[in-house]
């Protein structure tokens, strides 16, 4: 049973998404709180499932497939909802677009490389990017309540969330470049073999 826990956590993260969307649209404090808690649970299971899989020696093909999909679904859903409700607005939308575009590009690149039996390992910088994304989205989801709790002069939860969103977008560009360079190098080396 313990060996199945990482995959159960990953699948659970996907199952959380519709409930997260419903909670996001619940009015008031309890809606904000419920959406935030569900996002935190999803973010924590992202860390936990990989760690458990490595600890238990249960890294599986299913986990390799579903983990990045689950990550992208929760992040993309949260960013789209935050843009739709105006929390992320104006030029800040560019940061969300950068993040979403990178996720699509890198997913395609991973798929392309997988055909050649080449794995694209997650870099430490990409892990940092993910942590910053999760924290920024969590702060942005915290709404007015978060602003009351986190408020240092001109920096409240929303402002800090936007700053971290831009930082994660910058890391997103850097890691996308790194992954694309590796992918292009591989594609060119394959072309040279022909």
Predicted segment positions?
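C-terminal membrane-associated helical module and adjoining short loops/tails
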Residues: 1-7, 17, 27, 35-43, ...
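Hydrophobic alpha-helical transmembrane segments of integral membrane proteins
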Residues: 2-3, 11-15, 64-67
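Residue-level signal for threonine
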Residues: 10, 60, 123
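Core segments of transmembrane alpha-helices
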Residues: 12-19, 70-79, 106-107, 129-141
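Active-site His/Glu-centered metal-binding helix of metallohydrolases
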Residues: 15, 44-52, 69, 73, ...
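Membrane-embedded alpha-helical segments that form the functional core of polytopic membrane enzymes
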Residues: 16-65, 78-98, 156-173
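Membrane-water interface of transmembrane alpha-helices
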Residues: 104-112
